[in-house]
Curated annotation (Swiss-Prot):
Protein name listed in UniProt: Cytochrome b
PROSITE patterns named in the record: CYTB_CTER (PS51003), CYTB_NTER (PS51002)
Residues reported in the UniProt entry to bind heme b b566: 97, 196
Described function: Component of the ubiquinol-cytochrome c reductase complex (complex III or cytochrome b-c1 complex) that is part of the mitochondrial respiratory chain. The b-c1 complex mediates electron transfer from ubiquinol to cytochrome c. Contributes to the generation of a proton gradient across the mitochondrial membrane that is then used for ATP synthesis.
Transmembrane feature ranges: 33-53, 77-98, 113-133, 178-198, 226-246, 288-308, 320-340, 347-367
Coiled-coil spans in chain: none
InterPro entries tied to this protein: Cyt_b/b6_C, Cyt_b/b6_C_sf, Cyt_b/b6_N, Cytb/b6-like_sf, Cytochrome_b, Cytochrome_b_C_euk/bac, Cytochrome_b_N_euk/bac, Di-haem_cyt_TM
Organism: Eospalax rufescens
Subunit structure: The cytochrome bc1 complex contains 11 subunits: 3 respiratory subunits (MT-CYB, CYC1 and UQCRFS1), 2 core proteins (UQCRC1 and UQCRC2) and 6 low-molecular weight proteins (UQCRH/QCR6, UQCRB/QCR7, UQCRQ/QCR8, UQCR10/QCR9, UQCR11/QCR10 and a cleavage product of UQCRFS1). This cytochrome bc1 complex then forms a dimer.
Gene: MT-CYB
GO cellular component, one term: mitochondrial inner membrane
Amino acid sequence: MTNMRKSHPLLKIINHSLIDLPAPSNISVWWNFGSLLGVCLGLQILTGLFLAMHYTSDTLTAFSSVTHICRDVNYGWIIRYLHANGASMFFICLFLHVGRGMYYGSYSYLETWNIGVILLFAVMATAFMGYVLPWGQMSFWGATVITNLLSAIPYVGTSLVEWIWGGFSVDKATLTRFFAFHFILPFIITALVIVHLLFLHETGSNNPTGLNSNADKIPFHPYYTIKDILGFIVMFLFLMILVLFSPDMLGDPDNYTPANPLNTPPHIKPEWYFLFAYAILRSIPNKLGGVLALILSILVLVLLPLLHTSAQRSLMFRPISQCLFWILVADLFTLTWIGGQPVEHPFIIIGQLASILYFLIILGLMPLAGILENKIMKI
């Protein structure tokens, strides 16, 4: 009699995706982040569901409903902080996952990569709308500033902003629709994740060498299930340290002040995971130019397969490209720091130089390094 997991129509899909999946024998810890992202998504949906049971999306009661969750609901404080800091963990894993894809040339799986970029946009949109929901000062002004960027679109900009707001300013209608979208988007993200995995399992996983690994595969279970579980334990350890010891470390103190349209905070800034893009936006004096640079800072990932000039897929054996990659990582840290600073000298010029370097490395220097390495190795 055949094993049920191999014959049952539903279990068969799970078996081919998680148990008997042939995986390269040499994939490193950098391949853990996919499963960690799945766990983060599950955690966010679960904690978000419990928060939604107590939250009210009304401008008069939103702030006090979040306070009520933290003070009066059983374990409400831990659910709220797991959700807020879980988002930070989500983005840490997301950035490392994308970085891994860039380093090891995983972008040559076009469909998987492009769905991944769409997922990145969807997660960023969800996180932005979630940040508006507590209706603190930074929620309100962050929503006002970021939605206002759409007014830079010629001709239809102003109408588009008012349509998104549901009025002439960020108000009750805006909060209600942001809550609705924030609730539905994670389920759309889950559907996209399934498509992402579907495309990945069509080709099989990449590996650190970038070479074909068909000759050397091992079953996913037990080898990589154990490895993934270790990843979960480490991630939850860091998350719980953050939640239980310093839950507000990554938040903004201004968000503990109820939203007031008559009082602007001294420095309007988004959550830390958007600061690099925010710095690129601010580095261009023109509004439309800034918005385009902001979108391009993420959309540039779609161009990576077209910009790949090297005969080798991975950066593992390419020292010049490796140097450029780590300069790019340092540049992103610089942009994140600049995004949190006020718009004054010397931060303006540092931000502008870091923004130029970001696009220069991805669009110019990396492809040139690939050609140079081919020449050096006579490929």
